[in-house]
């Protein structure tokens, strides 16, 4: 793979990451408005309590976890672009 092809592929990956992050941030923002708390505070309060089976909370937690992974992936691709 040539250097230009690597840059193009990496740029595409960055765009995919940014799109996924945008969607997840919208989901998380709507849940934070609904429950009136920030994600980190809300999940910190849930630690040590029985697992909530409310589908909204589960979806919120999964989205929050996925957001962390997408941000890590984005950072890795941005690091490649710097080379």
Annotate the PLM regions:
Residues 7, 19, 48-50:
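Generic secretory/membrane-interface signal
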Residues 10-24, 28-31, 60-63, 67-70, ...:
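Amphipathic alpha-helical coiled-coil segments
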């Amino acid at each position: 793979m040539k250097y230009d092809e690597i840059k193009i592929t990496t740029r595409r990956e960055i765009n995919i990451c940014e799109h996924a992050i945008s969607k997840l941030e919208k989901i998380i923002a709507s849940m934070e408005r609904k429950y009136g708390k920030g994600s980190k505070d809300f999940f910190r309060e849930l630690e040590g309590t029985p697992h909530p089976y409310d589908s909204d909370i589960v979806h919120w937690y999964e989205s929050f976890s996925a957001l962390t992974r997408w941000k890590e992936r984005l950072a890795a691709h941005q690091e490649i672009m710097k080379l």
